[in-house]
Amino acid sequence: GLGDVYKRQRAKSYLSEALLHSFAESKKNHVDFYRRYLTRVSLDLGEDLYKNVTTDKRVENFKETHDAHLVATYFQFGRYLLICSSQPGGQPANLQGIWNDKLFPSWDSKYTCNINLEMNYWPSEVTNLSELNEPFFRLIKEVSESGKETAKVMYGANGWVLHHNTDIWRITGALDKAPSGMWPSGGAWLCRHLWEHYLYTGDIEFLRSIYPILKESGLFFDEIMVKEPVHNWLIVCPSNSPENVHSGSNGKATTAAGCTMDNQLIFDLWTAIILASQILNTCLLYTSDAADDSLRV
């Protein structure tokens, strides 16, 4: 079919372009490309005492040697993986990495938003790979749009919602089983990464561009949270502590109300909204509501 013809043509174009350059030139371009990222940060944990030992043996012997230089190497390996799998213009780093070789990979190679996707990007700002957030931030922008329909249909609410998974089509609804799927706070966690990018860069124009995403996520929680009857706290219900069970439930109960994780994520989100609105001098009425709500979480 036409699709196969296109794939062959595209593959040939890549090969033709590659063959225009010698091996030495291609290797130099490759090394230079990675070096400009990797050399921004170094981690010195002392002398390399095992430099004549192969890496597989160093890993095998780590319990006995406590090989500090291997730890520093592993630190850079983590940065290398993000450099490989999150180049601007592409897709974000997923559960399996860019070189997955299976038609049906584990967990569908999706984006799991109840910690995995966030963990992939924890090193981005603190290890000076800030621009590699671009695919991730584009995903957040896209789920903030698709999540508006989910918020309206599932919860009758304004704003946007994301549950524990999304994919290349930017799904946002609850899926899989209750211990993981019935968790509507993925959007709040992703918003934290937008706010942290501003904290690291001080980029006012970036903050201005993502403020509506923060605000609409906060609006969703403002509309769906309910009062806890004893203390009059605002809580998310139903929800869960992702992939966790309640103590005392014999490992059976998962769906809950007012989970600590939700409380912290939403308090953090509203705090970011309040601070951002003060910096941008905007939405003061909404900010007042958010400040009141945050005190009741």
Residue ranges and their predicted role:
Residues G1-Q9, Y286-D293:
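Conserved small/polar residues in nucleotide/adenosyl-binding loops
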